[in-house]
């Protein structure tokens, strides 16, 4: 029988019906989160797995980047900058300002309270950042860079390329940058981040009745990088805008001088785009556009759709006469004119010189012979009206060299803040100077202790009289300050002995005041006995002491184990520690120690997942650590909640055995909110007390599944092995040298 191919019209119809059916089915799908919205979400612990990386688990980005000819890459970027493309022509024939905005917006979502955001990972490629209102048309900037990425492939990540393109742009326009470091690996999926709870773009429901911005958020409105350039919620009040600027830039770790340098330096270049009303001209964002758009969004149907018809923020104009050159014109214009409110062609509020002054100063970005007045945003006027900002801008205007250096350093900080210590930096353009915000630690300057030394040091620790729980709590306090989001904290540096960490409530300051001097004495006495230039740091002693305590706890439970230990940590000094910068690392909740303060912005169980995410733990690792730390009596302030064992200080699987024991009946405590009591079902006798974090391992189906593995008769050995492996992982999270 002869078979015929379907006609194109029939094929199109079948495709249309299939797509419609698929969309209907997808729209009707009901997820678990709909039925049980309060159920604890464990998905943050399962993101960024190696299986999602197309380069494979063995891919070594540092090695790949090391093979890169960085000079050649920069030359190629420089060529792209001045090669205008018909599909998206360059303003003033130069893509430099466009790429600066791309790099800035890639890095500028960094926030200090949880370390999320920043350029690492290249998250600007993914939703929601890819489609944020503040990132309009940056999809085109990355497409302009695709030939560079295509050429060099796995040798340079998108995360590094976007920042490097910003640096090269500055240099090509006459600015001397402070340096550049590679080392940002790419993510392959969107990061799960709390960007706010608003349901509409540019909505603002993130301030309390006092006007305080909710933590850990860094922007004033949903979909903005920092603040509304027209003023808070679109109200053109420069002083109110200054307050928002100070708050949001402060949440990005910038002080007033750095903030001024960034705004004034960045707005020296380029222009804003608001040739038409976005509501009438601009189409769907990249995520909402059809497949035929191939990932590009905001299609503009007005005029050419680009060039002099470009619509981005809705604001329109340039700040300086020479938008592709490093000059002092931004500050000169800010103070040289009296500024009055005006409206862009799109109807957005901006500022222009009064009485028509400067009407013909600024050349059009695309139309030869056409000129305009310079413009300012409300947030620019804030740099003149706010007393502190005015002092800084006035000083910079009088001292161009100081302004240039301040902008160079602030730009470097902006684009490198989430990379962690300088030891993670790659490439030939890394500046030699160590900066305080990099949390510097002295370089290893001595031979490390060997196996025999380690054994002798363990004996000294055990003979010190410090209890097992005290050693475990101290080591955990030192190492668990690490944040995988911005690679800060950790045991290296022994900053636990310095302010502010030694005074954090979660770290039991009174206990530290007793334990640390004893460990310091052990360190000093031991170093006196060493030969051959060998030394051991207090940072190493703290970690080794924790491991030694765990070995002792395991022996008490009938196990002979060795907790892995790699020496080589160093001790930071007070001069290398910015107290205010480290203050934001203070845990307001650490569920692994059953610690929760009123300042925690997450409920206990969610705080557990958040802390585990920061420690880059998997669900089994998190589970093993909680169970082990409970039986080791490692709760903050020696609290007994969740210590489900009659032998605290022994490493056993008792936490899971007793949690899963059906002879215990649990109920809420009638006297203490947030606590639970476990009673013997037969006698009614009180057995245990617990927090929601303790009980979540029996109530949450997925966590219970893991708890059952460790609570089974054949799960004892597995638990001990898994606990030690997870403990060692946490102790080494900041060991970027191994």
Swiss-Prot record:
InterPro entries: Catalase_peroxidase, Haem_peroxidase, Haem_peroxidase_sf, Peroxidases_AS, Peroxidases_heam-ligand_BS. Keywords: Heme, Hydrogen peroxide, Iron, Metal-binding, Oxidoreductase, Peroxidase, Signal. The record marks 101 as: Transition state stabilizer. The active site is at residue 105. Binds 1 heme b (iron(II)-protoporphyrin IX) group per dimer. GO terms for biological process: cellular response to hydrogen peroxide; hydrogen peroxide catabolic process. It catalyses: H2O2 + AH2 = A + 2 H2O; 2 H2O2 = O2 + 2 H2O. There is a cross-link at residues 104-226 (Tryptophyl-tyrosyl-methioninium (Trp-Tyr) (with M-252)). Its cofactor is heme b. Formation of the three residue Trp-Tyr-Met cross-link is important for the catalase, but not the peroxidase activity of the enzyme. It comes from the Bacteria. It holds the Pfam family peroxidase. This is Catalase-peroxidase 2. It comes from Shewanella amazonensis (strain ATCC BAA-1098 / SB2B). The lineage of its organism: Bacteria, Pseudomonadati, Pseudomonadota, Gammaproteobacteria, Alteromonadales.
């Amino acid at each position: 029988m002869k078979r015929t191919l379907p006609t194109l019209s029939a094929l199109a119809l079948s495709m249309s019906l299939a797509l419609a059916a698929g969309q209907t089915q997808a729209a009707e799908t009901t997820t678990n989160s709909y039925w049980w919205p309060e159920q604890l979400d464990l998905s943050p612990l399962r993101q960024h797995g190696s299986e999602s990386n197309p380069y494979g688990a063995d891919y070594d980005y540092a090695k790949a980047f090391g093979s890169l000819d960085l000079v050649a890459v920069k030359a190629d970027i420089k060529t792209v900058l001045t090669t205008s493309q018909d599909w998206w022509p360059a303003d003033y024939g130069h893509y430099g300002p466009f790429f600066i905005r791309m790099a800035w917006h890639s890095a500028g979502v960094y926030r200090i309270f949880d370390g999320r955001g920043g350029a690492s990972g290249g998250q600007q490629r993914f939703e929601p950042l890819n489609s944020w209102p503040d990132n309009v048309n940056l999809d085109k900037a990355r497409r302009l860079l695709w030939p560079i990425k295509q050429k060099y492939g796995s040798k340079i990540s998108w995360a590094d390329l976007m920042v490097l393109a910003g640096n090269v742009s500055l240099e090509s326009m006459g600015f001397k940058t402070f340096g550049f470091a590679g080392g940002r690996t790419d993510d392959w999926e969107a990061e799960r981040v709390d960007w706010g709870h608003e349901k509409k773009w540019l909505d603002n429901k993130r301030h309390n009745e006092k006007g305080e911005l909710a933590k850990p958020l860094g922007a004033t409105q949903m979909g903005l990088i920092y603040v509304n350039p027209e003023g808070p919620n679109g109200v053109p009040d420069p002083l109110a805008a200054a307050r928002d600027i100070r708050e949001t830039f402060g949440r990005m770790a910038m002080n007033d001088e750095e903030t001024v340098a960034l705004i004034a330096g960045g707005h020296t270049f380029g222009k804003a785009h608001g040739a038409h009303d976005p509501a009438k001209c601009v189409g769907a964002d990249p995520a909402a556009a059809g497949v035929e758009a191939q990932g590009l969004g905001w299609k503009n149907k007005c005029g050419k759709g680009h060039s002099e018809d470009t619509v981005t923020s809705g604001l329109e104009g340039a700040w300086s006469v020479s938008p592709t050159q490093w000059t002092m014109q931004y500050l000169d214009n800010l103070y040289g004119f009296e500024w009055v409110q005006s409206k862009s062609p799109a109807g957005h509020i901006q500022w222009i010189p009064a009485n028509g002054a400067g009407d013909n100063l600024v050349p059009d970005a695309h139309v030869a012979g056409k000129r305009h007045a310079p413009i300012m945003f409300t947030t620019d006027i804030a740099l003149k009206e706010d007393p502190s900002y005015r002092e800084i801008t006035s000083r910079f205007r009088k001292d161009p060299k100081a302004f240039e250096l301040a902008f160079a350093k602030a730009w470097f900080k902006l684009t490198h803040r989430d990379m962690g210590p300088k030891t993670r930096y790659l490439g030939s353009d890394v500046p030699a100077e160590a900066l305080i915000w990099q949390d510097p630690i002295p370089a290893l300057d001595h031979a490390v202790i060997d196996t025999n030394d380690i054994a002798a040091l363990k004996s000294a620790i055990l003979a010190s009289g410090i209890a097992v729980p005290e050693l475990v709590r101290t080591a955990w306090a030192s190492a668990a300050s690490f944040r995988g989001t911005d690679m800060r904290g950790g045991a290296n540096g022994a900053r636990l002995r310095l302010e502010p960490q030694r005074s954090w409530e979660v770290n039991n300051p009174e206990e530290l005041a007793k334990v640390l001097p004893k460990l310091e004495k052990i360190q000093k006495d031991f170093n006196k006995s060493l030969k051959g230039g060998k030394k051991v740091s207090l940072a190493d002693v703290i970690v080794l002491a924790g491991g030694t305590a765990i070995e002792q706890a395991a022996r008490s439970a009938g196990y002979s184990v060795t907790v892995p230990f790699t020496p080589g940590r160093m001790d930071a000094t007070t001069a290398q520690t910015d107290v205010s910068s480290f203050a934001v690392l203070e845990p307001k909740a650490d569920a692994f120690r059953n610690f929760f303060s009123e300042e925690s912005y997450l409920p206990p169980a969610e705080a557990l997942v958040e802390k585990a995410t920061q420690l880059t733990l998997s669900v089994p690792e998190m589970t093993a650590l909680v169970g082990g730390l409970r039986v080791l009596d490692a709760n903050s302030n020696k609290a007994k909640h969740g210590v489900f064992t009659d032998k605290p200080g022994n490493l056993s699987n008792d936490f899971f055995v007793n949690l899963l024991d059906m002879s215990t009946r649990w109920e809420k405590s009638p006297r203490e909110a947030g606590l639970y009591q476990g009673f013997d079902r037969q006698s009614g006798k009180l057995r245990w007390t617990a927090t929601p974090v303790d009980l979540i391992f029996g109530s949450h189906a997925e966590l219970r599944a893991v708890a059952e593995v460790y609570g089974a008769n054949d799960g004892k050995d597995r638990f001990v092995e898994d606990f030690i492996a997870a403990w060692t992982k946490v102790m080494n999270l900041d060991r970027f040298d191994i």
